[in-house]
Protein backbone atom coordinates (compact mmCIF):
# COMPACT_ATOMS: atom_id res chain seq x y z
CA UNK A 1 0.00 0.00 0.00
CA UNK A 2 2.74 2.40 0.97
CA UNK A 3 4.60 1.60 -2.23
CA UNK A 4 1.57 2.33 -4.41
CA UNK A 5 0.94 5.54 -2.50
CA UNK A 6 4.51 6.76 -3.08
CA UNK A 7 4.34 5.85 -6.79
CA UNK A 8 1.12 7.80 -7.25
CA UNK A 9 2.55 10.80 -5.37
CA UNK A 10 5.69 10.83 -7.51
CA UNK A 11 3.62 10.62 -10.71
CA UNK A 12 1.47 13.57 -9.58
CA UNK A 13 4.57 15.62 -8.70
CA UNK A 14 6.17 14.86 -12.09
CA UNK A 15 2.99 15.74 -13.94
CA UNK A 16 2.61 18.99 -12.01
CA UNK A 17 6.25 19.87 -12.78
CA UNK A 18 5.71 19.25 -16.48
CA UNK A 19 2.52 21.30 -16.46
CA UNK A 20 4.14 24.19 -14.54
CA UNK A 21 7.03 24.51 -17.02
CA UNK A 22 6.23 27.28 -19.56
CA UNK A 23 6.17 26.27 -23.17
CA UNK A 24 8.60 28.14 -25.45
CA UNK A 25 6.70 29.87 -28.25
CA UNK A 26 7.93 31.24 -31.57
CA UNK A 27 7.82 34.76 -30.10
CA UNK A 28 10.29 33.81 -27.34
CA UNK A 29 12.61 32.27 -29.90
CA UNK A 30 12.45 35.40 -32.04
CA UNK A 31 13.21 37.65 -29.04
CA UNK A 32 16.16 35.47 -28.03
CA UNK A 33 17.62 35.42 -31.52
CA UNK A 34 17.11 39.18 -31.87
CA UNK A 35 18.89 39.76 -28.56
CA UNK A 36 21.83 37.61 -29.67
CA UNK A 37 21.95 39.50 -32.97
CA UNK A 38 22.01 42.85 -31.16
CA UNK A 39 24.83 41.69 -28.89
CA UNK A 40 26.80 40.44 -31.89
CA UNK A 41 26.23 43.73 -33.70
CA UNK A 42 27.26 45.69 -30.61
CA UNK A 43 30.50 43.70 -30.29
CA UNK A 44 31.24 44.22 -33.98
CA UNK A 45 30.71 48.00 -33.75
CA UNK A 46 32.90 48.25 -30.63
CA UNK A 47 35.66 46.21 -32.25
CA UNK A 48 35.47 48.25 -35.45
CA UNK A 49 35.62 51.50 -33.45
CA UNK A 50 38.70 50.33 -31.55
CA UNK A 51 40.41 49.34 -34.81
CA UNK A 52 39.64 52.77 -36.34
CA UNK A 53 40.94 54.61 -33.26
CA UNK A 54 44.15 52.59 -33.26
CA UNK A 55 44.57 53.11 -37.02
CA UNK A 56 44.32 56.88 -36.53
CA UNK A 57 46.27 57.29 -33.30
CA UNK A 58 49.12 54.87 -33.96
CA UNK A 59 50.71 56.78 -36.89
CA UNK A 60 50.17 60.10 -35.09
CA UNK A 61 51.63 58.87 -31.81
CA UNK A 62 54.54 57.24 -33.67
CA UNK A 63 55.39 60.49 -35.44
CA UNK A 64 55.09 62.50 -32.24
CA UNK A 65 57.27 60.02 -30.39
CA UNK A 66 59.89 60.11 -33.16
CA UNK A 67 59.99 63.92 -33.28
CA UNK A 68 59.96 64.36 -29.51
CA UNK A 69 62.48 61.59 -28.80
CA UNK A 70 64.95 62.53 -31.53
CA UNK A 71 64.51 66.25 -31.00
CA UNK A 72 64.93 66.01 -27.23
CA UNK A 73 68.07 63.89 -27.55
CA UNK A 74 69.65 66.19 -30.16
CA UNK A 75 68.77 69.57 -28.70
CA UNK A 76 71.40 71.43 -26.68
CA UNK A 77 72.22 74.89 -25.41
CA UNK A 78 73.90 75.78 -28.71
CA UNK A 79 70.59 75.17 -30.48
CA UNK A 80 69.08 78.14 -28.68
CA UNK A 81 72.13 80.41 -28.62
CA UNK A 82 73.74 79.93 -32.05
CA UNK A 83 72.25 80.87 -35.45
CA UNK A 84 72.11 78.60 -38.46
CA UNK A 85 75.31 78.41 -40.50
CA UNK A 86 75.57 77.58 -44.20
CA UNK A 87 73.01 77.21 -46.95
CA UNK A 88 72.00 74.99 -49.84
CA UNK A 89 72.88 71.36 -49.13
CA UNK A 90 75.08 71.90 -46.04
CA UNK A 91 73.87 73.57 -42.86
CA UNK A 92 74.99 73.45 -39.25
CA UNK A 93 74.92 75.55 -36.11
CA UNK A 94 71.81 76.25 -34.09
CA UNK A 95 68.32 77.71 -34.42
CA UNK A 96 68.59 81.03 -32.58
CA UNK A 97 67.69 82.98 -35.73
CA UNK A 98 64.65 80.77 -36.42
CA UNK A 99 63.44 80.91 -32.82
CA UNK A 100 63.66 84.71 -32.60
CA UNK A 101 62.13 85.07 -36.06
CA UNK A 102 59.22 82.79 -35.14
CA UNK A 103 58.51 84.77 -31.97
CA UNK A 104 58.75 88.06 -33.88
CA UNK A 105 56.39 86.91 -36.63
CA UNK A 106 53.91 85.52 -34.09
CA UNK A 107 54.13 88.71 -32.05
CA UNK A 108 53.30 90.92 -35.04
CA UNK A 109 50.63 88.60 -36.41
CA UNK A 110 48.88 87.93 -33.12
CA UNK A 111 48.92 91.61 -32.07
CA UNK A 112 47.13 92.71 -35.23
CA UNK A 113 44.80 89.70 -35.37
CA UNK A 114 43.82 89.93 -31.69
CA UNK A 115 43.03 93.65 -31.86
CA UNK A 116 40.97 93.43 -35.04
CA UNK A 117 39.44 90.03 -34.23
CA UNK A 118 38.26 90.86 -30.71
CA UNK A 119 36.92 94.27 -31.71
CA UNK A 120 35.17 92.79 -34.75
CA UNK A 121 33.69 89.96 -32.69
CA UNK A 122 32.41 92.40 -30.06
CA UNK A 123 30.87 94.61 -32.74
CA UNK A 124 28.94 91.90 -34.58
CA UNK A 125 27.88 90.16 -31.36
CA UNK A 126 26.88 93.15 -29.22
CA UNK A 127 26.27 96.25 -31.34
CA UNK A 128 25.18 94.99 -34.76
CA UNK A 129 24.07 91.40 -34.34
CA UNK A 130 21.39 91.15 -37.03
CA UNK A 131 22.32 94.02 -39.33
CA UNK A 132 23.32 93.65 -42.96
CA UNK A 133 26.84 94.81 -42.14
CA UNK A 134 27.24 92.06 -39.53
CA UNK A 135 25.96 89.46 -41.98
CA UNK A 136 28.41 90.75 -44.60
CA UNK A 137 31.28 90.58 -42.11
CA UNK A 138 30.37 87.00 -41.17
CA UNK A 139 30.22 86.00 -44.82
CA UNK A 140 33.58 87.62 -45.56
CA UNK A 141 35.18 85.99 -42.53
CA UNK A 142 33.88 82.56 -43.54
CA UNK A 143 35.23 83.04 -47.06
CA UNK A 144 38.59 84.21 -45.71
CA UNK A 145 38.81 81.18 -43.43
CA UNK A 146 38.40 78.91 -46.44
CA UNK A 147 41.13 80.54 -48.55
CA UNK A 148 44.26 78.33 -48.76
CA UNK A 149 47.22 79.69 -46.85
CA UNK A 150 49.45 79.61 -49.92
CA UNK A 151 47.01 81.94 -51.71
CA UNK A 152 47.18 84.37 -48.78
CA UNK A 153 50.96 84.18 -49.00
CA UNK A 154 50.96 84.98 -52.71
CA UNK A 155 48.59 87.92 -52.19
CA UNK A 156 50.86 89.16 -49.41
CA UNK A 157 53.84 88.83 -51.74
CA UNK A 158 52.18 90.88 -54.48
CA UNK A 159 50.75 93.51 -52.14
CA UNK A 160 53.31 93.93 -49.35
CA UNK A 161 56.59 92.70 -50.80
CA UNK A 162 56.21 94.07 -54.35
CA UNK A 163 53.59 96.86 -54.36
CA UNK A 164 54.46 98.53 -51.05
CA UNK A 165 58.14 97.71 -51.49
CA UNK A 166 58.65 96.21 -48.04
CA UNK A 167 60.67 93.31 -49.42
CA UNK A 168 60.96 90.00 -47.61
CA UNK A 169 60.57 91.12 -44.02
CA UNK A 170 59.13 90.40 -40.61
CA UNK A 171 56.40 93.00 -41.04
CA UNK A 172 55.20 91.53 -44.34
CA UNK A 173 55.23 88.01 -42.92
CA UNK A 174 53.56 89.04 -39.66
CA UNK A 175 50.73 90.93 -41.38
CA UNK A 176 50.12 88.04 -43.75
CA UNK A 177 50.03 85.70 -40.78
CA UNK A 178 47.55 88.00 -39.03
CA UNK A 179 45.16 87.70 -41.98
CA UNK A 180 45.34 83.92 -41.59
CA UNK A 181 44.67 84.09 -37.82
CA UNK A 182 41.99 86.79 -37.93
CA UNK A 183 38.95 84.61 -38.88
CA UNK A 184 39.49 82.20 -35.99
CA UNK A 185 39.67 84.99 -33.41
CA UNK A 186 36.66 86.97 -34.61
CA UNK A 187 34.42 83.89 -34.83
CA UNK A 188 35.41 82.50 -31.43
CA UNK A 189 34.95 85.95 -29.87
CA UNK A 190 31.46 86.22 -31.33
CA UNK A 191 30.51 82.71 -30.21
CA UNK A 192 31.85 83.33 -26.69
CA UNK A 193 29.85 86.56 -26.37
CA UNK A 194 26.70 84.93 -27.69
CA UNK A 195 26.87 82.33 -24.93
CA UNK A 196 26.36 85.07 -22.34
CA UNK A 197 22.62 84.99 -21.44
CA UNK A 198 20.55 87.93 -22.67
CA UNK A 199 19.02 88.19 -19.19
CA UNK A 200 22.40 89.45 -17.93
CA UNK A 201 22.42 92.26 -20.49
CA UNK A 202 18.79 93.16 -19.83
CA UNK A 203 19.37 93.28 -16.06
CA UNK A 204 22.36 95.59 -16.51
CA UNK A 205 20.44 97.88 -18.87
CA UNK A 206 17.52 97.96 -16.46
CA UNK A 207 19.89 99.44 -13.88
CA UNK A 208 20.80 102.26 -16.26
CA UNK A 209 23.94 100.92 -17.96
CA UNK A 210 24.53 101.68 -21.64
CA UNK A 211 25.81 99.19 -24.23
CA UNK A 212 29.47 100.15 -23.83
CA UNK A 213 29.35 99.72 -20.05
CA UNK A 214 27.57 96.37 -20.35
CA UNK A 215 30.21 95.10 -22.77
CA UNK A 216 33.25 96.41 -20.88
CA UNK A 217 32.23 95.46 -17.36
CA UNK A 218 29.97 92.46 -17.85
CA UNK A 219 29.77 90.45 -21.06
CA UNK A 220 33.49 90.55 -21.85
CA UNK A 221 34.28 89.20 -18.38
CA UNK A 222 31.84 86.33 -18.85
CA UNK A 223 33.16 85.57 -22.35
CA UNK A 224 36.84 86.01 -21.52
CA UNK A 225 37.65 82.26 -21.14
CA UNK A 226 36.25 81.50 -24.60
CA UNK A 227 38.02 84.49 -26.14
CA UNK A 228 41.36 83.46 -24.64
CA UNK A 229 40.89 79.92 -25.93
CA UNK A 230 40.20 81.22 -29.44
CA UNK A 231 43.25 83.50 -29.38
CA UNK A 232 45.63 80.76 -28.27
CA UNK A 233 44.08 78.36 -30.80
CA UNK A 234 44.68 80.87 -33.60
CA UNK A 235 48.27 81.39 -32.44
CA UNK A 236 48.85 77.63 -32.39
CA UNK A 237 47.47 77.31 -35.92
CA UNK A 238 49.55 80.23 -37.15
CA UNK A 239 52.64 78.74 -35.54
CA UNK A 240 52.47 75.76 -37.87
CA UNK A 241 52.12 77.73 -41.10
CA UNK A 242 54.88 77.76 -43.69
CA UNK A 243 53.31 78.70 -47.04
CA UNK A 244 52.36 82.33 -46.23
CA UNK A 245 55.85 83.01 -44.88
CA UNK A 246 57.69 81.50 -47.84
CA UNK A 247 56.34 84.31 -50.04
CA UNK A 248 56.63 87.16 -47.53
CA UNK A 249 59.46 86.44 -45.05
CA UNK A 250 61.76 84.14 -47.08
CA UNK A 251 64.50 82.86 -44.74
CA UNK A 252 67.68 84.17 -43.19
CA UNK A 253 70.49 82.69 -41.13
CA UNK A 254 70.82 85.95 -39.23
CA UNK A 255 68.87 87.21 -36.25
CA UNK A 256 66.29 89.75 -37.52
CA UNK A 257 67.57 93.31 -37.16
CA UNK A 258 64.81 95.32 -38.88
CA UNK A 259 61.11 95.03 -39.63
CA UNK A 260 61.50 95.94 -43.33
CA UNK A 261 63.84 94.80 -46.10
CA UNK A 262 65.24 92.04 -43.90
CA UNK A 263 64.36 88.33 -44.43
CA UNK A 264 63.49 86.38 -41.30
CA UNK A 265 64.14 82.80 -40.26
CA UNK A 266 61.40 80.66 -38.69
CA UNK A 267 61.08 77.12 -37.39
CA UNK A 268 58.57 75.77 -39.89
CA UNK A 269 60.94 76.59 -42.75
CA UNK A 270 63.64 74.54 -41.02
CA UNK A 271 61.29 71.56 -40.73
CA UNK A 272 60.03 71.86 -44.31
CA UNK A 273 63.32 72.52 -46.14
CA UNK A 274 66.06 71.03 -43.97
CA UNK A 275 64.31 67.65 -43.77
CA UNK A 276 64.76 67.35 -47.56
CA UNK A 277 68.49 68.09 -47.53
CA UNK A 278 70.95 65.18 -47.71
CA UNK A 279 73.19 66.09 -44.76
CA UNK A 280 72.76 64.63 -41.29
CA UNK A 281 73.27 68.08 -39.71
CA UNK A 282 70.25 69.41 -41.61
CA UNK A 283 68.10 66.49 -40.46
CA UNK A 284 69.26 67.09 -36.89
CA UNK A 285 68.17 70.73 -37.06
CA UNK A 286 64.83 69.69 -38.56
CA UNK A 287 64.17 67.29 -35.67
CA UNK A 288 65.14 69.95 -33.14
CA UNK A 289 62.85 72.50 -34.80
CA UNK A 290 59.98 69.98 -34.73
CA UNK A 291 60.55 69.39 -31.03
CA UNK A 292 60.55 73.13 -30.31
CA UNK A 293 57.32 73.65 -32.27
CA UNK A 294 55.61 70.80 -30.41
CA UNK A 295 56.86 72.17 -27.09
CA UNK A 296 55.52 75.66 -27.88
CA UNK A 297 52.12 74.31 -28.97
CA UNK A 298 51.82 72.13 -25.85
CA UNK A 299 52.77 75.12 -23.70
CA UNK A 300 50.14 77.30 -25.38
CA UNK A 301 47.44 74.66 -24.87
CA UNK A 302 48.42 74.23 -21.23
CA UNK A 303 48.38 78.00 -20.74
CA UNK A 304 44.94 78.16 -22.36
CA UNK A 305 43.55 75.59 -19.92
CA UNK A 306 45.08 77.35 -16.91
CA UNK A 307 43.81 80.78 -17.98
CA UNK A 308 40.33 79.47 -18.78
CA UNK A 309 40.03 77.79 -15.38
CA UNK A 310 41.34 80.88 -13.63
CA UNK A 311 39.01 83.34 -15.34
CA UNK A 312 36.07 80.93 -15.02
CA UNK A 313 36.51 81.01 -11.23
CA UNK A 314 36.75 84.80 -11.24
CA UNK A 315 33.58 85.28 -13.26
Annotate the PLM regions.
Residues 2-55, 304-315:
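Transmembrane alpha-helical segments of polytopic membrane transport and secretion proteins
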Residues 124, 191-194, 205, 232, ...:
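C-terminal transmembrane helix and the adjacent membrane-cytosol boundary/short C-terminal tail
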Residues 87, 245-294:
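Interhelical loop and adjacent transmembrane-helix boundary motif
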Residues 93-123, 231:
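Transmembrane alpha-helix signature in integral membrane proteins
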Residues 142-179:
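Generic hydrophobic transmembrane alpha-helix motif, especially the helices
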Residues 211-248:
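Transmembrane alpha-helices
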Residues 148, 207-208, 221:
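Glycine/proline-centered hinge or cleavage motifs at structural transition points of membrane proteins
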Residues 109-141, 154, 162, 305-310:
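Transmembrane-helix boundary motif in ABC transporter permease subunits
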